[in-house]
């Protein structure tokens, strides 16, 4: 599994975390379900993290794997297609996210309105003026109402037949616009694709909207459940909201918070509302293999404590690669050529940690239902 062509210490090395960094990393690992009791269902993972980046389907599923026990990628597909308990849509920061269906409408209302201006600009660059974009959004709604679920190709075919240009990036931003307007979400799997469906049909009518203070309080509380300890700037960056909104949400739940000497805030009670039990400090997570765009790299302003000097090997051109985590730090990268896990270590790890990563590699293959290599 380990790449024999790569030196075991390809980088300059990643200095051990300071005691303070280790404490914060361990707390966040518990919040992220990377330490402590694993989730039993995909919906529990999505509920704890609130939103999992979903532009890479395999990466989103691997984020569920590493935070749960005994699940498979097929279980995530079942939640998307049969149970309708999970959906994928453009939300925070204008990025596709996997979320619980119950959390879709609150997140949509909070994080998407400010994205329409940028979407209109990009559509204009694709030669689609506002009136044509409005018409296309209406057509998408009509086609999904009549024929949905529809794959990307099926939707493009219908739009083209109606005289709507879909070449270049036009289709991407037209479906983005329909999502921002609450018309469509990506729900069921058709083959290996996430098909588009009408949001109101797939999820039901949107519930009554709370006032903004209540909504921002909900967001702050849910964010901290999966990301504490954190700062107001961490929340603002993760949600793609102005800092003033993050502050407003945190102020609304101030009686529920503990602020440490490090300036980081935490929920005073467990995410389920029970009192925090006194006990030893949480331990750093066990060695694991994390997939592309893993939430551990997207929940806070800084990724330095996790990636250290290895960031150039893991983050390239805005793409966040798969990486190996040991002691709360990235120590290598990994890939799946031919369905086999290939691990490239960027620094030395102990034999025990290497064996743990190899064991986790087998679980990756189990989760993805990859065929075992043929024996000779």
Where in the sequence are the language-model features?
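Non-catalytic regulatory appendages
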Residues: 255-310
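Short, amphipathic alpha-helical interaction segments positioned at domain boundaries
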Residues: 108-122, 201-221, 286-288, 296
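Short, cationic-aromatic polyanion-contact patches
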Residues: 98-104, 190-209, 264-280
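Glycine-rich, small/acidic residue-mixed loop/short-helix segments
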Residues: 314-376
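Short amphipathic alpha-helical interaction segments
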Residues: 71-78, 165-177, 243-250, 316
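A short, conserved structural fragment
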Residues: 81-91, 95-96, 179-189, 254-261, ...
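Loop-centered beta-sheet repeat module
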Residues: 168-246
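Phosphate-backbone binding and catalysis cores of DNA-processing enzymes
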Residues: 1-153, 157-167
């Amino acid at each position: 599994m380990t790449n024999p062509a790569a030196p075991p210490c390809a980088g300059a090395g990643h200095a051990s975390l300071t005691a303070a960094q280790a404490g914060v990393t361990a707390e966040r690992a518990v919040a992220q379900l990377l330490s402590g009791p694993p989730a039993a269902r995909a919906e529990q993972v999505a509920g704890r993290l609130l939103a999992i980046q979903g532009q890479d389907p395999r990466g989103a599923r691997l984020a569920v794997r590493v935070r749960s026990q005994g699940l498979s990628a097929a279980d995530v597909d079942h939640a998307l297609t049969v149970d309708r308990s999970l959906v994928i849509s453009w939300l925070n920061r204008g990025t596709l996210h996997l979320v619980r269906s119950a959390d879709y409408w609150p997140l949509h209302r909070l994080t998407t309105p400010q994205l329409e201006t940028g979407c209109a600009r990009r559509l204009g660059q694709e030669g689609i003026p506002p009136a044509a974009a409005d018409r296309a959004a209406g057509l998408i709604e009509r086609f999904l109402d009549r024929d949905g679920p529809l794959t990307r190709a099926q939707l493009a075919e219908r739009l083209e037949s109606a005289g709507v240009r879909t070449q270049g990036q036009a289709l991407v931003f037209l479906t983005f616009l329909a999502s921002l307007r609450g018309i469509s979400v990506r729900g069921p799997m058709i083959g290996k694709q996430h098909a588009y469906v009408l949001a109101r049909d797939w999820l039901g009518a949107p519930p009554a909207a709370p006032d903004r203070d209540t909504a921002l309080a909900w967001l702050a509380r849910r964010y901290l459940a999966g990301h504490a300890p954190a700062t107001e700037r961490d929340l603002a960056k993760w949600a793609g909201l102005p800092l003033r909104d993050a502050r407003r949400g945190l102020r609304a739940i101030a009686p529920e918070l503990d602020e440490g000497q490090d300036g980081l805030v935490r929920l005073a009670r467990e995410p389920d509302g029970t009192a925090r039990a006194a006990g030893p400090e949480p331990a750093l997570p066990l060695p694991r293999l994390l997939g592309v765009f893993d939430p551990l790299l997207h929940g806070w302003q800084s990724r330095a404590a996790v990636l250290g000097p290895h960031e150039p090997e893991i983050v390239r051109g805005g793409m966040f690669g798969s990486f190996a985590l040991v002691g709360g730090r990235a120590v290598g990268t990994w890939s799946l050529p031919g369905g086999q896990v290939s691990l490239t270590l960027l620094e030395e790890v102990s034999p025990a940690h290497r064996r743990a990563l190899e064991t986790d590699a087998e679980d990756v293959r189990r989760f993805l239902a990859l065929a075992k290599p043929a024996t000779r």
